[in-house]
Amino acid sequence: MSSNLAFLSLSLAESTASLGKSLEETRTRLTEKLKLVAGMALGFDQFAMHQTATGPGLSVEGKQTEQMSRKSAEDTRASSLSSDPDDGRAAQLAGQKGHVTPCIAGLIATSNPFLFTHMLALGAAYLGYDKYFGDGTSELLPFYGTRTLLSTLSPLDTPRLLDSMAAADRLSPKRSILSRFSRRKRSLDAPAPEPSGWDQKRKSRLPLGSLRLVLDILDRHLEALTTYVQQQIEIFRQAGVPLEASVTMTHNLNRLHVTRCQSRNNQMVIPCRWKDTTFFEELSNETNPGLTDEEQLEKRVKFHKLENAFNTVTGLGALEAMLDEDSVLLGGPAEESVARLYSDFHLGAAMNNWYFYDALNINKMLSRFQKVGTKVLKQYGLENLMNLATSHQAGSTASWDRTDIDTKLAKHHHYGSALRVRLYIMALLPQFTPHREGILSPVDFIREAFAGERSYAMSTARLKPLLSDDLVILGVPKGFSFLWLFEFLLEEDSPNALVAKRRALKRIPNWTKRLFSHSRSIPMLFRQFYKALNAGVFAKARRRTLDRSKTLLSRQLPEGWRDIVMDAFAFTAHSAALMQVVNYHSLFRDRTLNDLQEASYLATPPAFSIEDQSVMKRCDEQIYEWSRFGFSPDVLEADLHNETFKGKWENLRLETMPTPDTHQWWRRLHRAILDSLEIYQAHERHLKGMSDNLYTLVEDTIKNLQDGSSRDDTIFFGRIARGARESVGQKMWRGVKTFFLDLVRDVPGSDHAVWFGVGFNFPRIFQILRKMKEIALHAAGDQGSAILLDEAFVELVQETVAVRAQTYRRQPPTTLRNIGVIGLRPDYANLDTEQRSMEYQLSMCADHCVSLWVQILGFIYPYVLNPSLLTDYEKSFGTGHAIKKLDDPSYVNSFRYIFANDASLNFFEHNTPQDTRKALVSLKSGQAFMYANMMRFAGIAFEQLSMPYLAVSLQRQAPFMGQMVKDWVAKRSRSRKLAIVSVLSLGLIFAYTLLSALDIAQFLTDSGMKAIEDCSWNPIMQQMACVVVAGSGSLVAPTFAALSDVFKVGLYSGIGSTLIAASVVGNAYMIIRSQSRTILRTEMAIKNVAVKLWKQMRKYFSWVTRFTKRRKAILSTMMARATALAKNKKPRSETAATMTRSGDSVMDMLLQGVSPATPQRAQDGSR
C-alpha cells in the first residue's frame, strides 16, 4: 500500500519524503486532497454516486465523509452562483461566469492530452480507492501515477501497467485452422516478435462500474498518446537525430540535447531550451530572408513540427527524470518543459487524426448517438430528453425536471444500462458555455464546432493545475479533440469494439489477391472476368457502380484532397523543352559548334551532337553498355558536373574532393539530358532577351535540373502523342493495321515519345492512398464500388485538373488536346519568376497529372491495400545472394532470379498501365530508359511501405531491368512471328500429308480391283454366266500391292522426310515457346550464361593476344636499339651471339615490372 500511496502522492504534487513519518496521517491527507481534486473539481463524484448502486466505490467508512464532501461541493457551487465568481473550486471550472457540470469539464473539456491523462489517473484513484489504498484483507491492486504512465509509453509496457491496475488480461486473436497448418514456419533462431497489447482484446475481472469505465478510457487514451509520441520521435529521426522508440525517454532526451544543444561560453547546458538548439538557428526566419513564400511556408511548418517534437520529448524525459530525485536533468529548463507539456492546448488537435474523426464521421456518430440514445433512455421513460435536445427546447434549465430524472434512475441498478443512461443525460444536459455566453449541451457544442460556426479556439474553463499553483487556461479547438469518448456511449463493449474496428482497418480485402496478385495460377482472363462480374458486366451497370464509387470518394476523401491532386507533383523538366533535344534533334546543325569544348571539365568531354541522335537514344545506349559490362567505376563519368571537378587541376583541392557513388546511375543520365539542353541553349543563344517562349522555357528547365536536389528527385517519363481526330478511312486503316500488329504482339511504332521530368511528394500521395484504403474497407458491403475506387478517383482527378489547370484555354475551341503541342500562355516569357513558375507547373499538370495518378494507382495503390503481396519479393531480395548481386547486370537474366521472383517482368505485366505498356512496345528509342525510371519510381514508393530490400534492389537494378524488358518485348514479338510461320509450316505439312494419304489410298484401290467381267443370265442353268474381258485383269494381287506401296512410302519418308519430321518438332516447339513465358525467360537465362562464358574466353584470349603483341613490340624495339649500339661498340660477330638473348632477358624484365637498367649495370660491373 505504501508504494501505491507514493504514486498517489506524486500525482497530487506531494513529496514522498513525508510517507515515512506517519502512513495513516499521509493517507488521510491524500484522501482529502483526492476528494477535493478528483471528487468535486473533476466531477468523478458523479460516477461514485452510481458506483454505490452497482459496486464498491469508496470504503464503507468513507461514505459518510463522501456525502459531506458532496454536500459541501454543492454548497460551494451554490455560493459561486450567488457570490463572487472567484470563490470556490466550482467557479474555477467555469472561468468568470456561471458553472459548468464538473464531470463534463473533467472528461471532455480539456484539450491537452497529457493533462487529460492526469485527470483520468486521479479519477481512477478516487473511484477505486478501496482497491488501491484500502485497509481490507483482500489483496490490493497496484496503482501507477501519471508520471509512471507517461514515462513508460510503449505498445508493450503501458498495457501491462494498465492491465495490472484493472485486473485485466489480454486475449490473443484466435488463429484459423489454415494458419495453424501453414507450411511456413518461423526459424528457431528468429523468435516471434511480441505483439502489441493494444492489438488484443481486453478482459477485465473488475465488476461493471465507473472504475472499469475510466480505466477503459485511460487505456484507449494512452494508446493514442503512444502513437503520437512515436510520431514525434520519427520526426527527429527524419531530421537526423538518433532517437529510438524502444529506449526510455530519458535516453532520448540525452541524445537529443547532446547533439542539438548549442554551447554557451564554451559550456553546454543539458537540457537546454528550444531557442538554444541548432534547429532554432537553422530554421528561424532571420537566417534565410531570400527564400520564396512557398519555401518560407515549408520552413515554418518544419520549424513548428520540430518545436512540438522537442517539447514533447524533453517534457516526457524530464517527467521520467523527476521519478529520480538525484537526477542531474532536474532544473529550470526541465521543469519548464514539463509545465509546457501539461499546458499546451494545441496538442489536442492531433486526436482527430488518431481516431479518424472528420466531418462525415461526426455526422454519422451524432446520428447513431440519437438512435441508440433514444433506445436506451426509453427503458427508463426518459425518451423526452432526447426529444427536447432534438427540438432545441433546452434553452433553459426549467425544461429539465432533475428530480424526476433522479427518481427514475434510482429504480434501476443494472450497470449495463444505468451508467450509460447517466452518460447520455450528462451529454444532453444543458450547461453554461463561456464561448457562447449561454446555455449549450455538449452534443450541441459538437454540432456547432463541426458546423464551422466557431473557427477559433474556444476557452471553456480555468482549472487549477495539479502540479503547480499557477492557473492554466484550457481550450477546446475546432474539431473537439476527445469525441472518441462517445464511443463508450454507442458500444456495449467499447474498448474491444475499438480493437475490432482497428483490426477491420488492418484487414486485407480478399479481392485484392484475385486482382493484383502476381501469381501465375490466376490468368489475366480470370481477373478481367472477376472484375466485370463484381463491377458490372454491361456498360450501364458498370457506370452505376462507378458513380457510387465517386460518391464515396467525394464524401470521405480528406478536406483539401483536390489541392493534393495538384500539388503531389513538382515538374522539373518541361515536355516542350525536352522535345527540342528528342523529337526535333535532327533539325539542329551543331556539329561545327565548339560549345562543348568551352566547358570547364578536368578532361575533354566526349564529342557528341544532338543532331546525330536524340538524348534518349544516347541514354538507351548507355544503359545497354551498363547491362553488358556493369556500372563504370570512373569517378569523372559518375559525377561529371560536381562543383569540385570544375576548373583546372591547380585549383583542385584533393582533400575536399568527394567520392561520388558510381552506382547512382540516374545522376549520369540526368547529366546527359542537362548537357543536351545546354547545347540547345548555346545553339539558340541569339534568342536570349527576345521574350521567346520556347527559349525561356528551356532556360527554366535547365535551372530546375541544375538544382541540387533535382538530380535525385527527378524521374523521367514518356508518353506517346496520338492524333486527336481521325477520318473514317483513317480509323478503318488503323483498325486493320492494329489487328495485324496484334497478331505479332506489336503496336504501331513511334520514333519518339513526349518526355518530361517530375518529382513526387510521396507523403501527400500516400495520404490519399491510405484514405482510399480506409474507404474500400468501409465499403466492404459494396464490393463492386470498392473495386472501382481507382477508376472513380481517376475521373475525379480529370475533373479537378480540367478546372484547376484551365485546360479549356490551352487549345483552340472545338479541338482536343494533343500533348505534343505546346500549351503555354502566349505571354509566358514576359511573366515574372513566380507567375512563370506557376504557369510552368499548371501547363505540365494539365497534360500529365492524370497519367501520373494512373501510374500511381497502378504501381502503389494495390500494395497499400494489401502490402503482403510484396512480402515474397522482400524476402527474395533480402537474401545474402541477392544483396551481393545488387550491381550485377546479369542477375536479372539468371536462373535463380527468374525462378525465384522475376519481379521486373511481373511489374511490367501486372502493374504497368495499358497506355504505358503500349508506349514501351511502340517506341524505337527510350524503352530501357523509361522502364528504368519506372522501376526507380516503384523502388522509392516501396520505401514508404517498409520494404527496404525490395526498394533498394529495384533502384539499383533499374537500368538492367529496363534493358531486360526491352529485350523481352523484342523477343516476344519475334517469337510470335516465328510461331505464325511455324503454324503455316505445320499447316502445309499437314495438307501435304493428307493429300499423300488420299493419293495412296486411291492407288491402293485402283491397283487392288478385280478383273472386269461381262456377265449375262443363263436361263437353262438358272445362273449368271460371266466372261472375263480381255486386258481388264488386275496387275498384281491386292495384298501384294498394299505391301509394296507401304514399303515404298516408308522408304521414301525414311530417305526424304527426316527433315520434315525435324521441322514438325521444331515448329511445334516454336508455337509452344511463343505461349510460354517460362521457356522464353529460360532461353534468355541460357543466353546470359553463354554470354558470360564467351566473355571469359574472350578475356583470356585477349590477354594472351595483348601480351604477345606487347612482347613482340618491345622486343623489336630492344633489338633495334641493341643493333644500333652494337654497330658503335662491338664487332658484328660478338653482337650476333648475344643479341637475341639480351633482348629476351630485357623483355622479360620489362614484363615483370623490373627496371632493365639494374641487370645491365650488374652485368657491366661483372665484366
Swiss-Prot record:
Where do Basic and acidic residues bias regions lie? 68-77
| Parts of the chain on the Extracellular side | 999-1167
Stated membrane topology is: Single-pass type I membrane protein
- Recorded GO CC terms: extracellular region; host cell plasma membrane; membrane
Cytoplasmic side residue ranges read: 21-977
Specify the superkingdom. Eukaryota
Query: Which residue spans traverse the membrane?
Result: 978-998
Q: Where primarily located?
A: secreted
Disulfide cross-links: 1015-1026
Q: What induces it?
A: Readily detected in oocysts (at protein level). Specifically up-regulated in sporozoites, but not in tachyzoites and bradyzoites.
Task: Identify the stretch annotated as signal peptide in this record.
Answer: 1-20
Q: Where in the cell is it found?
A: Secreted; Host cell membrane
Q: Where is this region: Disordered?
A: 55-94
Keywords assigned by UniProt, alphabetized: Disulfide bond, Host cell membrane, Host membrane, Membrane, Secreted, Signal, Transmembrane, Transmembrane helix
What does the record give as the function of this protein? Answer: May play a role in host cell invasion.
Could you say which protein family the record assigns here?
Belongs to the apicomplexan parasites RON2 family.
Q: What is this protein called?
A: Rhoptry neck protein 2-like protein 2
What organism does the record attribute this protein to?
Toxoplasma gondii (strain ATCC 50611 / Me49)
**Taxonomic lineage:** Eukaryota, Sar, Alveolata, Apicomplexa, Conoidasida
